[in-house]
Amino acid sequence: MLDPIAIQLGPLAIRWYALCIVTGLILAVYLTMKEAPRKKIIPDDILDFILVAFPLAILGARLYYVIFRFDYYSQNLGEIFAIWNGGLAIYGGLITGALVLYIFADRKLINTWDFLDIAAPSVMIAQSLGRWGNFFNQEAYGATVDNLDYLPGFIRDQMYIEGSYRQPTFLYESLWNLLGFALILIFRRKWKSLRRGHITAFYLIWYGFGRMVIEGMRTDSLMFFGLRVSQWLSVVLIGLGIMIVIYQNRKKAPYYITEEEN
């Protein structure tokens, strides 16, 4: 088992979980700022947004996690704020971040679709890296399996939990998000019929579908009417993504690649 603490500085413990999240954030900010001028968005506005959105998204992710495990946390109130032990729900962070983005874009007079489109691939790569925090914490894993011989030894050993090998669902989602990120980079450079909002829609559909499938492998999620709560939210994301494509096509939204860039 790998030590979840990366660096120990006296009483201060810096955990791999935090490093994975922060690394993903830094890379996401860099990529978003790099693409921002293409959509006539000031890069400094991206930094201003992150300073507001990131802490609120962390709070939203934790609140979502605590709410759906309230039976436990109502008896362990002191652990509600112990985010260093894990327990950040991505959907809670996404919902909070989207709300903050909408308000921020409105106040800065930035087109919300443009902001979402340049942020979507960055969010995907941040999620891909962030999932490795679950790996170090030995959480968000799947059902038991006979062996994991197809995986590198360090992953196989870390996924040996409570006397059994577990499906490395963190890895599946990380790779799925990485592939989605790569596809978006290709689409937004090569697909000339890509309209404003289409990248956001692709993110919602791609992530929603992958999460719905992978979530079915997990054993630690809350069930609701035969599906896990996260799977229901995945269905919502997929439906929302499809609606965005239809809506933007019908209103003939501007193309992502402008005539000046062709």
Curated annotation (Swiss-Prot):
The cross-references to NCBIfam families, in alphabetical order and at most eight, read: lgt (TIGR00544)
Q: What does this protein do?
A: Catalyzes the transfer of the diacylglyceryl group from phosphatidylglycerol to the sulfhydryl group of the N-terminal cysteine of a prolipoprotein, the first step in the formation of mature lipoproteins.
The subcellular location is:
Cell membrane
A Pfam family assignment: LGT
PANTHER family in the record: PHOSPHATIDYLGLYCEROL--PROLIPOPROTEIN DIACYLGLYCERYL TRANSFERASE, PROLIPOPROTEIN DIACYLGLYCERYL TRANSFERASE
Q: What PROSITE patterns is this protein classified in? A: LGT
InterPro entries the record matches = Lgt (IPR001640)
Q: Where are the transmembrane segments?
A: 9-29, 41-61, 80-100, 109-129, 167-187, 197-217, 226-246
Gene name as annotated: lgt
GO CC terms: plasma membrane
Name the lineage: Bacteria, Bacillati, Bacillota, Bacilli, Lactobacillales
Which positions are annotated as binding a 1,2-diacyl-sn-glycero-3-phospho-(1'-sn-glycerol)? R131
The name on file for this protein is Phosphatidylglycerol--prolipoprotein diacylglyceryl transferase
Q: Which family does it belong to?
A: Belongs to the Lgt family.
Q: How does it sit in the membrane?
A: Multi-pass membrane protein
Q: What pathway is this protein said to act in by its record? A: Protein modification; lipoprotein biosynthesis (diacylglyceryl transfer)
Which UniProt keywords are given for this protein, alphabetically ordered?
Answer: Cell membrane, Membrane, Transferase, Transmembrane, Transmembrane helix
EC no. given is 2.5.1.145
